[in-house]
Amino acid sequence: MEMLDQSLRRLQTDHLDLWQVHGMGFGNDPELAYRKGGVIEALEQAKQSGKVRFVGFTGHKDPEVHKRMVELGFPFDTVQMPLNCFDASFRSFEQTVLPELTKRGIAPLGMKPHGGRAGAIKKGIVTAEEMLRYAMSLPVTVTISGVDSLDVLQQNLRVAQDFTPMTAAEMQAIRDRAAPVAADGRFELYKLSLKFDNPEARMAHEFPLDPQSVEVREMVAASENTGRPFP
């Protein structure tokens, strides 16, 4: 709550429309969030006090963590997650989490519509416009697309202004086109690499902050030798 109060002072406002717990992705994050004194209590206090209107959580690593967060029962207003045509074939938030949110009336916020990288677009597997339109055609409340240039902004605006949802057949055709290179996660490295972990979450789990450190490399090597996933 202290962090929320600091944000309100800096923003010079008395409330936030949406307050989300950032970067849920480690296997025991749900249990830590729901324990006594955990972040769920802070979300409850924030809503009850009127300091926030809506609360949710984000994450890009593991759909099972998202699903567990929801199944434990707190009435989240929003859940933010990566949704794109490559996700459908690898650790899929679309397949695992999206139906659960729809069932519970929780607003899905789709992020990383282009997979977080431009590799697939550069290789000609799909176009940027196709990927954005695919993500917007899913049953989401909003699609969040990163913009790093005026050209990208104009491209996104064109897709939005001319938007018509893809048919089920069109969406399946794009999934099928992406599947041969999607199944190993090469275009969704945020699900695999420590480089994309939230630093605060890494510290909470006592991981070194530098993903290139010797300690991390040793842990990854040990994981490869035992066949156990890391993290």
Regions found by a protein language model. Give the residues of each.
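Structured C-terminal cap/extension of enzyme domains
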Residues: 72, 96-231
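Glycine/proline-rich, positively charged
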Residues: 1-92, 96, 102-109
